[in-house]
UniProtKB/Swiss-Prot annotation:
Gene Ontology cellular-component annotations: acetylcholine-gated channel complex; neuron projection; plasma membrane; postsynaptic membrane; synapse
Family as reported in the entry's similarity comment: Belongs to the ligand-gated ion channel (TC 1.A.9) family. Acetylcholine receptor (TC 1.A.9.1) subfamily.
Bilayer topology annotation: Multi-pass membrane protein
Name the UniProt record assigns to this protein: Acetylcholine receptor subunit delta
Entry keyword Cell division: no
Residues bearing PTM Phosphotyrosine: 388
Phylogenetic classification of the source organism: Eukaryota, Metazoa, Chordata, Craniata, Vertebrata
Organism of provenance: Gallus gallus (Chicken)
InterPro entries per record: Neur_chan_lig-bd, Neur_chan_lig-bd_sf, Neur_channel, Neuro-gated_channel_TM_sf, Neuro_actylchol_rec, Neurotrans-gated_channel_TM, Neurotransmitter_ion_chnl_CS, Nicotinic_acetylcholine_rcpt
Pfam families: Neur_chan_LBD, Neur_chan_memb
Location in or out of the cell: Postsynaptic cell membrane; Cell membrane
């Protein structure tokens, strides 16, 4: 029991000594030396503090096209040397590193300059590591919402170049000098600058909509601003990302193309169905709905029209032309000889030339001299007979009926009339009413056949116009669809992040100092 108490006392004593050493060190640095966090860590006012910066990307959360905002989860790595925080480890029990609150130290106050929500600083102020050499290392996490101008030219087959621009709003280029982080290559033992955004494969979460193509980092010097200005220098991290278009291809592009090709089916639909205008108007309304959906996903900009917007406008113009064509076709189809007279050029072009060029079948023609057989109902014949009798005068009909009623026609004596007629004349007198009725019916049937034939010619003109527009609209739709979408499919990000710079800014190709 005594041995256990002795061991426990030794552990407590050793822990207390360690804590006391850190407390004594902190008291020595901040109280005895009189550390002032408001003063830059330089021996003289003309010296410049070198601040090194690096960015580790944990997650590309989203890119909101409407707000033009890039949301990222990052770690902002900052390091510098503060000569006032140096100590001899042998004097403080071998303590070589301190973990201090950021409020206790001088900070370069580096912020995200192109933020889009008014939050310039990091979200969480974690502890700062201070080493005995005066080296200060700070790695705070942050969720940044940065401004990213969207180029909608090739949406949804687009790529974007977004930036995270860091600078110090409190100190100018004469007070601090910003650099990219420097590391040492263990193989060559040479130093190099980290000229890219760091991505840890184990801690990085892939984005389902965007693919990172390039992620370079640069220090930018702006000679147009004086060194006394905070805008003279900055460290900018670039994210060149390409959209994964599968979602939009499945949900917008494919339905748009299928609905667009439904518009040409209107030329196959017979005019007598009465559904031609219904079909084409439905297609036009569907395209309008898709255009509204696309406009809600993109920023309200007048700089460019997105690729899918160009296609929808092209389809709407084409469908509008189809609506006009359908109106003309229906007008031709329901024309009659009583309202319109077909001109010779219309007859020659639409009944002779175009049907032959379009390989349209001609209606079967009756042989020369063959009677035209038409189906007529008995009611029609009765109506025509009644029309015949209505043509004759009432006096003639009354005389005939009265003669038949009183038998005068059979009791005519040769004494009161002229000599008896021949048998041919008597037969002619009996057959004349029947022949007149037959001639009237034949005349009417000829007029009806001529009327129907002319109406059929107008129907053939409408069908020819339908077939002609089918052969014209279909290639236009196919070529327009391929041309517009091939522009987007072959829209790739540049092979190098910066035009004119042969360096690719990747870990595999380090530039040694």
């Amino acid at each position: 029991m005594a041995v256990l108490l002795a061991l426990f006392g030794a552990l407590v004593l050793s822990g207390g000594l360690c804590v006391n050493q850190e407390e004594r060190l902190i008291h020595h640095l901040f109280e005895e030396r009189g550390y002032n966090k408001e003063v830059r860590p330089v021996a003289s006012a003309d010296e410049v503090v070198d601040v090194y910066l690096a960015l580790t990307l944990s997650n590309l959360i989203s890119l909101k096209e409407v707000d033009e905002t890039l949301t990222t989860n990052v770690w902002v790595e900052q390091s510098w040397t503060d000569y006032r925080l140096q100590w001899n480890t042998s004097e403080f029990g071998g303590v070589d590193v301190l973990r201090l609150l950021p409020e206790m130290l001088w900070l370069p106050e580096i912020v995200l300059e192109n933020n889009n929500d008014g939050l310039f600083e990091v979200a969480y102020y974690c502890n700062v590591l201070v080493y005995n050499t005066g080296y200060v290392y700070w790695l705070p996490p942050a969720i940044f919402r940065s401004a990213c101008p969207i180029n909608v030219n090739f949406f949804p087959f687009d790529w974007q170049n977004c930036t995270l621009k860091f600078s110090s709003l409190a100190y100018n280029a004469q007070e601090i000098n910003m650099h990219l982080k420097e590391e040492s290559d263990p193989e060559t033992e040479k130093n190099y600058r980290v000229e890219w955004i760091i991505i840890d494969p184990e801690g990085f979460t892939e984005n389902g909509e965007w693919e990172i193509i390039h992620r370079p980092a640069r220090k930018n010097i702006h000679p147009s601003y004086p060194t006394e200005s905070s805008e003279h220098q900055d460290i900018t991290f670039y994210l060149i990302i390409k959209r994964k278009p599968l979602f939009y291809v499945i949900n917008i592009v494919t339905p748009c193309v299928l609905i667009a090709f439904m518009a040409i089916l209107v030329f196959y639909l017979p005019a007598d169905s009465g559904e031609k205008m219904t079909l084409v108007i439905s297609v036009l309304l569907a395209q309008s709905v898709f255009l509204l959906l696309v406009s809600q996903r993109l920023p309200a900009t007048s700089h460019a029209i997105p690729l899918i917007g160009k296609y929808l406008l092209f389809i709407m113009l084409l469908v509008t032309a189809v609506v006009v064509i359908c109106v003309v076709v229906l007008n031709f189809h329901f024309r009659t000889p009583s309202t319109h007279v077909m001109s010779d050029w219309v007859r020659g072009v639409f009944l002779e030339i175009l049907p032959r060029l379009l390989h349209m079948s001609h209606p079967a023609e009756s042989p020369a001299g063959a009677p035209c057989i038409r189906r007529c109902s008995s009611a029609g014949y009765i109506a025509k007979a009644e029309e015949y009798y209505s043509v004759k005068s009432r006096s003639e009909l009354m005389f005939e009926k009265q003669s038949e009623r009183h038998g005068l026609a059979s009791r005519v004596t040769p004494a009161r009339f002229a000599p008896a007629a021949t048998s041919e004349e008597q037969l002619y007198d009996h057959l004349k009413p029947t022949l007149d009725e037959a001639n009237f019916i034949v005349k009417h049937m000829r007029e009806k056949n001529s009327y129907n034939e002319e109406k059929d010619n107008w129907n053939r003109v409408a069908r020819t116009l339908d077939r002609l527009c089918l052969f014209l609209i279909t290639p236009m739709l196919v070529v327009g669809t391929l041309w517009i979408f091939l522009m987007g499919i072959y829209n790739h990000p540049p092979p190098l992040p910066f035009s004119g710079d042969p360096f690719d800014y990747r870990e595999e190709n380090k530039r040694y100092i």
